[in-house]
Amino acid sequence: MDVIAMDKKNILILSTGDVNGAYEAAYKVAHIIKNMGHDVVMCVKHKTKNENFIKQYRHLSLSSAKANLVMRIVNKIKNKISPVEPSKVISTDMKYSFLSKNEASENIHIESMLKIVGFTPDFVFTGMTIDFLNSTDMLNIYNATKAKIYNITVDMNHFTGGCHYSWGCEGYIKGCGKYCPAITKEHEKITAKNNFERKYENAQKANFQIIAGSGLTLLQAQNSKIYKSQKTIHNINSLIDTKLLNSKNKSIAKKVFSLSNDCFYILTGAQNMEDPRKGFSYLLQALEMLDIELPMQKKEKIVLLVVSNSVNEEFGRVTFKKQKIDYIKDYRLLSLLYQAADLFINTSIEDSGPMMVSEALACGTPVVGFDTGILTNMVIDDYNGYKAPVMDSRKLAEGIRKVFELNKDDYENFSKNAVRQVEEFSSYEYAEEIFKQILEQ
C-alpha cells in the first residue's frame, strides 16, 4: 500500500450510469481502484448513487469569451475538413443491440468534463458509455490529457461497428463492410462500415487498450481487428465482492426463504426473460427432457426458482414445482438466495456475462449453462458445474442431471470449487492485482 501511495494516480472512470449491469461494473472498478489509494472520479451522464467521487457530467459555460471564440473557430475548421452529419435514427434488428449510431460525432465538451472532474487524469477506464460519449470523444480526451485509455468489454461494442452482440457476424474480426446484418435498410448499412473505420482510426491514434470482462470477450478482443495487436489483454471476470457474495451462510440460507432441506432447488433468471439472448426456450426443452427421463420420486424433489421482472409465459408448461421470486436488488438478500439454491442455470446464447454466473459460484452454488460469456472460463466440467454447447438442450439436461445426482461429498467439493474459482479469478482482490499491473506501467 505504501508503494501505491507514493505513486498515486489520477483515475477517471467513464460510464453512462452508476447502477445495474454494465454500469455497476464501472462502479465496482472505481471502488477497487479507489481502495488501492488512488484519486478516483467516476463521471456519468446519469447519477443515482450518493457517493461524492461520482460526478455528473454537464456542459459548463467557459468563463473566458476568448476561449469560446477559439473553440468555435476550431470546430468550424474541423467541420469544413471533415463534416459530421447529425446522428439519425437507423433501422436495426433489435437482437444485435446496434446502439452506436455515429462514431464521428462529438458529444461532450472536454474542458467542461475536466473542470467537473477536478484533475487531469493519468488513466481513463470506460465501460458502457452509450448515449454519453464515443471513441471520438475518447480521442479528444486523450489529445487534451495524454492519459492512458482502457476500454472494458462489458459487451462487444468497443470493437464493433456499432452492435453490442455479433450473433456470429465476423465484422469485428475482418472490419465491418457494406453488408451489416444488424442494419435492416440497405442504404443505411454503410453506417457500420463508417463507424468501424472511425473506431479503428481513433484507437490507433490514442493507443486505446482493452480489458476483457469475461472469457468470451477476451477471445473476441484477441481476434478483433482493432485490438488483436495488443500484447496482453487482462480479464477481470465480472468483479465479485466476496465480502457480500460468499458461502458463509449456506447452512441457514434455505430457512430464510422457507425452503425445504429435502428439495433440490434450481435457480435461474434475468431482468427480462423475454430477451432472445437469454435462451430460456432451451431451458424449457431441457426440463421437458428431464421430466420424461427422471423417475417420479426424483422429479418430486426438484423445484424451479425463477427470478425476473417478467417471466416467460411458456414457463407455465413446466411440470416441475416452480416458484417465482421478484427481482432482487439488495446484494445481501441475493447472496442468501444463491446460497439457498442447489444449482444455478444460465441459458444465455449470446451474452458477454452474465454476472449472475460468477455471483452464484461465489456463493458456493454449482452452475450449468451454455459455453459462452462468463461460463467459458469460470465453469469447469466435473469441477464446479457443467458447460453445454450453445443451444444444445440435450447436453444442458445432462449437465443438470449430473449435478442433481451428485452424492453429498461430491456436491460439497463442487461447491467449494465454485467459491475457489471466484476467489482466484473474479474477486476484488484478483482485480486489484490486475489494476496494479496496469497502473504501474
What spans do the regions from the language model cover?
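Short alpha-helical donor nucleotide-sugar binding micro-motif in glycosyltransferases
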Residues: 336-341
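Aromatic "clamp/platform" in nucleotide-sugar-dependent glycosyltransferases that forms part
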Residues: 349
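Conserved acidic donor-binding segment of nucleotide-sugar-dependent glycosyltransferases
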Residues: 381-382, 386-393, 402-408
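A charged, aromatic-enriched C-terminal amphipathic alpha-helix characteristic of glycosyltransferases
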Residues: 412-439
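Conserved donor-binding/catalytic core segment of Leloir-type glycosyltransferases
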Residues: 259-278, 284-287
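Nucleotide-activated donor-binding/catalytic signature segment of Leloir-type glycosyltransferases, i.e.
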Residues: 298-301, 306-335
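A short, active-site helix/loop in glycosyltransferases that binds the activated sugar's phosphate group
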Residues: 160-164, 187-232, 240-250
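Short hydrophobic beta-strand element within catalytic cores of glycosyltransferases
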Residues: 366-369, 379
